Design a protein with these regions (language model features):
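Catalytic-loop region of hydrolases
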Residues: 2, 13, 19-83, 92, ...
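Conserved acidic catalytic loop of the alpha/beta-hydrolase fold
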Residues: 167, 171, 178-197
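Conserved hydrolase catalytic core segment
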Residues: 195-234
């Protein structure tokens, strides 16, 4: 295990030892505490040694990457799975965080009911990562990072701009999903990891998996894209625009330069979270949990300012908890990046088949019947294009009522699909 320099746990990539000495076979960032768990996990930080050229034409430097690892790296360094998070996710994917968040990062419908008090420190995909789980840490070395533009340790709008000595704010460069993936590639280079056994993620994480397969076809053996797509539908673009405009319309956004002022756009950010959260659910799941039940069981209160229905109170709770852990500018930049994502436009001159022509990775696609934000049709179109090209692709559509959040909730049904897919892979 290589030593981390600095009291903040950071390591300057420019001073890293030789790549062959950087990660020992035992370099997990956690210690096991109970069966099936990767244990208590400490987030680490690494600074990339070189600037990154972005799709917008700008360069960014320095770049700090927050990361966690689970499992044991094989001597041949050929058992690595990179897990990529969704818009509201972060670096902490599995186990119990050594430093718990102020608010739970466990998304998914009724996550608090499911997780109880442990939710504040539990990784967002803990049910999928660990010994004997879908991404089996007895076999694989799983790496999770916070994406570029994030607010949980990786360089983003809240980071210091070296040109001014102040947080970037809205001076942060506009980024794309491809920029996120190039950053991940540069990070793995510093860890001496050349090839990935798999790249996996749900939602925006699945988009990153496909970017990996297209940008680095000779460096990725498999991808697992769950509840994802090749391009978000116009309705999804519209919902994301509404969420961003809620933030932009908040006077406390202050043109994006709100850091250190004592005011931040919590009202707009809260509305953005409400909008986003509803798109992650389904009419069926909302109806089953809340129906039209009143917040106060006796009667309506004749108020236009306070929640009258339980579902309204639930949304307010979601908003209040989200603003405690997430930065509004990160939401703006990440939301914009995922709406830009369009494989056919980026790589195929409008043709999805042409965009995927050079992909060599085996592909597992999992979609959910009630997901209207990333509907199964997107996964079906990806599967059809890959089959047209004679690629190795597997598609499963799970009948489930929870909407887009199924990828965080249907872990028990996803697990055998992922396990069987990865079992066909030689490591």
């Amino acid at each position: 295990m290589f030593e981390l320099a600095g009291s903040d746990g950071s390591y300057n990539g420019r001073d890293l030892p030789d790549r062959g000495d950087m990660i020992s076979p035992m370099a997990s960032t956690g210690s096991k505490t109970e069966p099936g768990s990767v244990g208590t996990i400490e987030t680490r930080f690494l600074n990339l040694p070189r600037p990154l050229r972005l799709d917008c034409g700008r360069e960014i430097f320095p770049i700090q990457i927050a990361y966690e690892t689970y499992g044991t790296l094989s001597p041949a360094r050929d058992n690595v799975i990179l897990v990529c998070h969704a818009l509201s996710g972060d670096v902490h994917a599995a186990g119990f965080a050594k430093a718990a968040s102020a608010a739970s990062t466990r998304d998914g419908f009724a996550a608090d009911d499911r997780d109880g008090a442990s939710g504040k420190s539990l990784g967002w995909w803990d049910g999928m990562i660990g010994p004997g789980k879908a991404f089996d840490t007895d076999r694989f070395f799983v790496v999770s990072t916070n994406l570029l533009g994030g607010c949980r340790g990786t360089t983003g709008p809240s980071s210091i701009n070296p040109a001014t000595g102040r947080p970037y704010g809205s001076d942060f460069p506009v980024i794309t999903v491809a920029d996120m993936v190039r950053t991940e590639r540069a990070f793995l280079d510093e860890l001496g990891i050349d090839r990935l056994a798999a790249v996996a993620g749900g939602s925006l994480g699945g988009m990153q998996a496909f970017e990996w397969a297209v940008l680095y076809p000779k460096q990725v053996d498999s991808i697992v894209a769950i509840a994802s797509t090749h391009a978000i539908q116009p309705q999804g673009v519209a919902w994301n625009a509404i969420a961003r405009n809620a933030i932009l319309a908040d006077p406390d956004w202050q043109g994006g330069q709100y850091y250190g002022t004592g005011r931040k756009p919590d009202a707009g950010m809260g509305i953005a979270r409400m909008v986003g959260h509803i798109t992650y659910l389904s009419a069926q799941s909302l109806g089953a949990k809340f129906g039209r039940r009143l917040q106060f069981a006796d009667d309506i209160r004749y108020t236009i300012t306070e929640p009258e229905f339980q579902v309204e109170n639930y949304l307010r709770y979601q908003a209040d908890s989200f603003v405690k852990r997430f930065d509004a500018n990160t939401y703006l930049y990440t939301s914009r990046a995922l709406t830009y994502f369009d494989l056919a436009r980026q790589y195929g001159n409008g043709s999805l088949v042409d965009a995927l022509r050079n992909v060599s990775a085996r592909t597992l696609l999992i979609a959910f019947s009630s997901d209207w934000l990333y509907p199964p049709a997107g996964s079906e179109e990806l599967a059809a294009a890959l089959r047209t090209l004679g690629k190795d692709v597997e598609l499963h559509i799970i009948e489930a009522p929870y909407g887009h959040d199924c990828f965080l909730l249907e872990e028990a049904r996803q697990t055998p699909m992922v396990q069987q897919f990865l079992a066909r892979q030689t490591v």
